[in-house]
Amino acid sequence: MDQEGNEALSLLKACEKKYPTSPEEAKLEVFENKYSSRDYEIEFDCPEFTSLCPVTSQPDFGAITIRYIADKLCVESKSLKLYLYSFRNHNSFHEEVVNMILTDFLEIAKPRWIEVVGKFRPRGGIAINVKATHGEK
């Protein structure tokens, strides 16, 4: 595989075990989409997402699915893993988490279309599912 143009992917080659402690500290990295002339869908399935309840600070568990059609840039998966991990000690409502992820993807990758779905485990007998989208598919 051609490595040219991937020098900016600092997290992929790093063996360091210092993880970001908040979404604001985390860094999504991107690489050039060599097939930007066509529409194709990229899907990240992240079944082990955790964050904290903003009221009780108890852990919330869920699955995050991110589907997008890239334009000129694609999000690198290790940076996404570390970014999502950074929510582990972050106090947020589920709706806020999903929209935050969507906003951060839009800012860094500028996809043609994106959908972020959060399916959260029941707390108090109620499961919460949140879907946020942007753009035309």
Language-model-derived ranges and their functions:
Residues M1-K137:
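N-terminal intrinsically disordered, cationic/polar leader segments
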